Every structure is written in C-alpha cells, then in structure tokens.
C-alpha cells in the first residue's frame, strides 16, 4: 500500500516509490496479510485504527524515495509551505500491528511515532524514527527489539523476550522497559527512570535469568525506581542521581561517573536542613543575649558612658 508514485528504470522495471504526500489509514476490520510473504505500507503518514496482521510488516513514513527491492527510504529534500505533520505513524489504542518481523522507519525530521496500541513481533521488532517515539501501549518482541529515535517516552511497556537495544537523546520511563536477555540503553543526554528498567527479567521486571544491563548516558536520574539485572548492571554516565528510594541492583554492579548522588529521601533532607538552620539562628540569638560582656575600660568615665548606652 502506498501513496507514492512508482518510478521505473530505463528498462521499464520498477525502481523506486516516490512519496511526497498522502496518508494510509487502516480502519474497520483491519488488514490481514498473513497469506502474503510481506505487507508494506509506504506513505507520508500512517494511521492504524484497527489490526494489521502479516508475516513481515514494513512501514515507511515521511517524504522519501523508497527502493522497491529492499525498501530503503531516502529522505527527499523538498521545500514546501505546507504544515509538517507532527506524527508519522500513529497506532491508536484500538489498533495494533502483529507479525513475525516488524520494521518501522520514519525519516522526516521532527515527525514522531505514537504507539497507543499493541505492536508485537514474534521474531524481531525495529523502530527508527527521526522524531519523538511515544509508547503509551505495548511495544514488544519475543526475540529481539531495537528502537532508535530523537527522544523516547514510555508510560507502559517496552519489552523483549530476547535482547533489547534503545538509542536516543532523551529517555523518560514511567512504565516497564525489560529484556529477558541482555539490554543496552544509550542516551546522549538525560535518562529519567521513574519505574522499572530490567534485564534478565519478565515484562513486569521480576528477574528470571542472568541477562546483563548496560547503560550509557549523559545523566541518569533514577527516582523512586528500579534499575536491575540478573547479571551485570553497568552504568557509564557523567552524573548518576539515585534518589527517593531509588535502587540499582545486579549480580554485579559497576558505576562509572564523575558525580554520584545516592540519597534516600531528598525532601526529608531539605526539611532537616531548614530545621537545623532555624535552630542555629535561635542558638546565635541566645548566645548573643546571654554572652558575657568583656568590654575593658581605662577610666571611670568610659565605664559610665558605656553603661548609659546599654541601658
């Protein structure tokens, strides 16, 4: 399925699909392509409001030249006064994509992928977005899952039954990010974890194996949350802030950082600091009020003048 224009080579063979505009929407009873070797949806934007089933499922969004043989998408350099879409691939809560292999590519700068439904692959799942990836549903593979985007926000489930790889500039997790085997997470700037990140674990973060978790980030903020693996947990970051009952566990734990903040209750510490400051102020006032006067006088006249001043 494509909104693009077929382009032929000199011999009349199909060479590319040129996609400049257009939307493909999956509605109603959905699309069952399991009898075909593969299903490919090529458009500037794609809306999935029903189920899509396939052996191999490919989506390509953005303004692209798409190779007809291998589906490699090369972004077109088009100047346009049209308003750019904010979402390239939108899987609604009532929609879903199910296949052995799923590959999602969005090339348009700043245009995101929104997954509110279920995207599930029995073999491999791959996401490559030149914008924001938002997971408010389930992004899952039984074997291998790789996701790359400018920024990633997960509120529900990102899970791999095998290895997991995430690469982004900013990662915010308030849900569960898990892998049954090894997990590698690379974040150029800030990784914020407020729930569970686990390797060697099931989708709820309970340890089931000895998979290792490797994290590379500019800054790691683990707040009232868990980073854990059944094997080695390795963090390489300029700053690591493990606060508010944050926990970092593993069979082995190695943290390489310039700044390590490991504090159980920052809010309580702030209150205690304020209380101590108040106590110090009271102490200073009491000391001033009851201090022994050691003023020295050289004459009776100086003494009388001083006593008159302090009356």
Residue positions per predicted region:
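Extracellular and secretory-pathway beta-repeat/beta-biased strand scaffolds
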Residues: 1-230, 234-237, 241-258, 263-284
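Extended amphipathic alpha-helical heptad-repeat regions
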Residues: 271-311
